């Protein structure tokens, strides 16, 4: 695979540069394929070898590359070495390239790219990923979709790299909003509606009580009293709250099943309502609590003692806040999991909140606060269903399935499917995930129903179509051809481009593992699918000599395998027919 070639190049370079091969391997990268011209297979940035390259001109660097190229010799692995602008370029023996790459893809299967030497010094860690985190008693809003699919991707990637991952869904099941909801249900709730469509009814009640609270201060007072009763453990208030919670989780579980997502632990803010009192006691024992003129209890984070930056940890009526419960949750998780890293996947509007939580953990003496990380993301604009209004995830999933079924029905090449609804949902979800993951996570983006379902271009539908097409090719010709294959005959430009691209998969995985951005994998898979589409037209399997047909089938099988691996990391279930 790529690293076998990298090591061979690194060993040659080490003899000339008097550096250990290990220090050079990560500086040698596979060259991205080009539509315009044939490219080398690997390149070394000469800048990476120069300690003081800030003072080196382009001419100096180019001269260094040329002199270095002259000292290196071709061998059985490398057939050509050339100096480019600021780079050294290496071309691999074509027959060796073909055999090695296809053999590695076949042998490694779902681990292809993950066994690379790029990850050889990666310590295995215990990692907690908190994601999704919807608020109970509300229908699953589409705003939680990003946290859900991003968190799932991060957990998938970390797990694939051999880390021990715990997926936590930290449900918003406590707080002042439940004072409002409890009061609202007592004023406007109907038992019959709660039984037939629980979360829609609770949402309607919540909207109504919020409107009333704006005009009637007595409603706000009742809400504060209800939440205070919850915090004090009032049986009647807790019973109603527990019912809302159970109904919510029941519905959320169905949504996660449709998304193909699971959690190791369902936790909630309510679990930490008592533990948050321990946090307050610890903060008090360290002399960190101060009371404001309004009676709220705060921690001064300014560092200057002027209260220019504070975090409120308790209201004037003695009830806890989100930040206090988050502190309790972090401390409990460290006790329970002894994590090396804890990742919170939440929108960028929460950035200040997490900065304050991490800062308070440090002030409290928890050095492991450095291991906590917030992965922020932007908002989705324009994701509304045909009905308009507030967009619930269930409505989006239903619309995804409906639109995809219509698209599939209008395409003549659509196969007869055993379960068209399931296929439509999987393809539709791929479309939504790819549109979401194409850019940087921190960026807001404009959702487009029309763009998301295009079968051509850079879409999730195109990825699924490519995978299904390659499955059909294998199904049509079976394994017989593979036995007769002589992969060394794969020397056409289309074959070489695919092989060169397959070389890069480990680098792409490495990039995503460093910055936790799925866009690298998305871009890679889209390019792979475009290369496969071109090759499918030009590299015929049917009517070719058996050894050529077998070799091409072997190539397409490798593409399908890597495509499926990448899609699964992104949280997409590949379809075999569509």
UniProtKB/Swiss-Prot annotation:
One of its GO terms (cellular component) is mitochondrial membrane. The modification N6-acetyllysine is found at residue 568. It catalyses: tRNA(Arg) + L-arginine + ATP = L-arginyl-tRNA(Arg) + AMP + diphosphate. It is found in: Mitochondrion membrane. Keywords: Acetylation, Aminoacyl-tRNA synthetase, ATP-binding, Ligase, Membrane, Mitochondrion, Nucleotide-binding, Protein biosynthesis, Transit peptide. A motif ('HIGH' region) lies at residues 133-144. It is an enzyme of class 6 (ligase). GO terms for biological process: arginyl-tRNA aminoacylation. Pfam families: DALR_1, tRNA-synt_1d. L-arginine binds at residues 133-135, 144, 322, 326, 350. Residues 1-16 form a transit peptide. The keyword Acetylation applies. Its EC number is 6.1.1.19. Its main location: mitochondrion. It comes from the Eukaryota. GO terms for molecular function: arginine-tRNA ligase activity; ATP binding. NCBIfam families: argS (TIGR00456). Belongs to the class-I aminoacyl-tRNA synthetase family. Catalyzes the attachment of arginine to tRNA(Arg) in a two-step reaction: arginine is first activated by ATP to form Arg-AMP and then transferred to the acceptor end of tRNA(Arg). This is Probable arginine--tRNA ligase, mitochondrial. It comes from Mus musculus. The gene is Rars2.
């Amino acid at each position: 695979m790529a690293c076998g070639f990298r090591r061979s190049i690194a060993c040659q370079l080490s003899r000339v540069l008097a550096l250990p091969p290990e220090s050079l391997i990560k500086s040698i990268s596979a060259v991205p394929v080009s539509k315009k011209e044939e490219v080398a297979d690997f390149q070394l940035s000469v800048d990476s070898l120069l300690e003081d390259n800030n003072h080196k001109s382009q001419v100096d660097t180019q001269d260094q590359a040329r002199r270095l190229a002259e000292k290196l010799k071709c061998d059985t692995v490398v057939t050509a070495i050339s100096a480019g602008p600021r780079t050294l370029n290496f071309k691999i023996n074509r027959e060796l390239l073909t055999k090695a790459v296809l053999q590695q893809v076949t042998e490694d299967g779902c681990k292809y790219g993950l066994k690379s030497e790029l990850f050889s010094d990666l310590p295995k860690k215990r990692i907690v990923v908190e994601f999704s985190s919807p608020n109970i008693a509300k229908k699953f809003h589409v705003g939680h979709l990003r946290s859900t699919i991003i968190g799932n991707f991060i957990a998938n990637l970390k797990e694939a790299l051999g880390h021990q991952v715990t997926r936590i869904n930290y449900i918003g099941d406590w707080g002042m909003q439940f004072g409002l909801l409890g009061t609202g249900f007592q004023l406007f709730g109907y038992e019959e509606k709660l039984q037939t469509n629980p979360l829609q009814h609770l949402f309607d009640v919540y909207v109504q009580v919020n409107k009333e609270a704006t005009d009637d201060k007595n409603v706000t007072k009742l809400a504060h009293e209800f939440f205070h009763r919850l915090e004090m453990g009032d049986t009647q208030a807790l019973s109603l709250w527990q019912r809302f919670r159970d109904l919510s989780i029941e519905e959320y579980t169905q949504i996660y099943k449709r998304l193909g997502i699971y959690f190791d632990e369902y936790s909630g803010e309510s679990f930490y309502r008592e533990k948050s009192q321990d946090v307050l006691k610890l903060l008090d024992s360290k002399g960190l609590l101060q009371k404001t003129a309004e009676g709220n209890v705060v921690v001064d984070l300014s560092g200057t003692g002027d209260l220019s930056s504070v975090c409120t940890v308790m209201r004037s009526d003695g009830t806890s806040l989100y930040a206090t419960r988050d502190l309790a949750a972090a401390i409990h998780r460290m006790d329970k999991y002894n994590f090396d890293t804890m990742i919170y996947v939440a929108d960028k509007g929460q950035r200040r909140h997490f900065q304050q939580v991490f800062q308070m953990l440090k002030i409290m003496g928890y050095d492991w606060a450095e291991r906590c990380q917030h992965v922020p993301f932007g908002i989705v604009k324009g994701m509304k269903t045909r009905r308009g209004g507030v967009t619930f995830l269930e409505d989006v999933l239903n619309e995804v399935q409906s639109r995809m079924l219509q698209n599939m029905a209008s395409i003549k090449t659509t196969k007869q499917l055993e379960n068209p609804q399931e296929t439509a949902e999987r393809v539709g979800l791929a479309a939504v995930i790819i549109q979401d993951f194409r850019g940087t996570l921190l960026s807001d983006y404009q959702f487009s129903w029309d763009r998301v379902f295009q079968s051509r271009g850079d879409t999730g539908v195109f990825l699924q179509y490519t995978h299904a097409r390659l499955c059909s090719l294998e199904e049509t010709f079976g394994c017989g051809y593979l036995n007769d294959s002589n992969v060394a005959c794969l020397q056409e430009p289309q074959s070489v481009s695919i092989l060169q691209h397959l070389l890069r998969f480990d680098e792409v995985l490495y990039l995503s593992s460093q910055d936790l951005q799925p866009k690298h994998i998305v871009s890679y898979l889209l390019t792979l699918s475009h290369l496969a589409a071109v090759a499918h037209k030009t590299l015929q399997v049917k009517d070719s000599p058996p050894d050529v047909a077998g070799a091409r089938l072997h190539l397409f099988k490798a593409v399908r395998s890597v495509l499926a691996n990448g899609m699964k990391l992104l949280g997409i279930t590949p379809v075999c027919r569509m």
